[in-house]
Amino acid sequence: MHPYRGWPFLTSPQHPTLSAVGAVFIHGGISLFVVLPIVLRSDKRVLYGVLVFIGGPAVDLDHVVAASSFRPHALETLKHRPDTHSLLFALALTALVYLITRSKQLSWSILAIIVSHLLFDAAGGDEYWLYPLKHPNSIPWLACPIGIALLFWASTRMASSAPPERDSRGQRSFAQT
């Protein structure tokens, strides 16, 4: 969690706990939106929807590690977001998930969730989203809604083009997220 200069109406330095709760719902909602077509195509919509909603704000657990605290004030006073808030980390994690699961939909979902998180945070500034580069440390605010719309579109394409994946017993597998 960090003050969003690009979204000043979403945070309040006087109310860091309220800002943290707001950030959880914002990141969870955006994450669910960007992979909603894949979630809706799944047999376990509710479970996957909840996991996706939790996954969006879970990206911010790196703040807790960097601040060594769960206190919202400690999280807000970090100089910048941790280096794991980067496109490089998103791509590396996506590649690792794909190597382990061989699931394009699951891997895409991980990438879309993290990138949607980065889009929102980078529009607020102080985000080394192209780590290890220090600049640019933000994106134009309009890139956030455009990027989120493109992620949703790509998820729609992914959900409509992928055949149902089955495990060795012929059952739909977890990869059908």
Question: Where do the protein language model's features map onto the residues?
Answer:
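N-terminal membrane-targeting hydrophobic helices
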Residues: 1-177
